[in-house]
């Protein structure tokens, strides 16, 4: 829950994280769904050997929540792309789907607790409208932000942005 996410703020850990390993391990949670729905999944890390110091549990939870939403709101057989980029002490992890997209009037509300867009209430998506709120709360705890760009009827991209302090790439 969101309260659990807030309570975890006091226990931020610093782990050595290879970004390719983070993406692969998070996506492994969806392996059955990927195969069942015949998804075309692309993972990319730039540069390939990128490594940071950060809270693995929080980064993993954020990524799992974003990927989970991408699966919920896009059809079987569609493409899902996850790209992690480390450049100039800035980490960005983007999750792009070919789903239904988000109407402009819903964009400002999607990170609110318990908010679900009207079309998702009528779909068999499950969930309670907490995933994006939790992801954003965890991103804030790490000093970052989650942004969204969406074209209604075409798809969405959710991006975690973290400024990493110093030369050690810390998150």
Question: How should each PLM-predicted stretch be described?
Answer:
Residues 39, 143-144:
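Conserved glycine-rich
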Residues 19, 101-112:
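Short helix N-cap motif at coil->helix boundaries in the Bergerat
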């Amino acid at each position: 829950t969101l309260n659990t996410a807030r309570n975890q703020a006091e226990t931020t850990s610093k782990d050595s994280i290879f970004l390719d390993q983070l993406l692969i391990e998070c996506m492994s949670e969806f392996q059955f769904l990927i195969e069942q729905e015949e998804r075309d999944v692309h993972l990319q890390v730039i540069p390939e050997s990128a490594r940071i110091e950060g809270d693995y549990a929080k980064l993993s939870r954020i990524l799992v929540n974003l990927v989970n939403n991408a699966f919920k709101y896009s059809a079987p057989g569609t493409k899902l792309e996850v790209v992690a980029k480390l450049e100039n002490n800035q980490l960005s992890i983007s999750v792009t789907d070919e789903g239904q997209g988000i109407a402009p009037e819903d964009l400002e509300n999607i990170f609110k607790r318990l908010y679900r867009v009207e079309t998702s209430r009528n779909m068999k998506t499950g969930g309670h409208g907490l995933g994006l709120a939790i992801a954003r709360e965890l991103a804030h705890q790490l000093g970052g932000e989650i942004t969204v760009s969406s074209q209604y009827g075409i798809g969405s991209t959710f991006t975690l942005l973290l400024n990493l302090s110093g030369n050690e790439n810390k998150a």
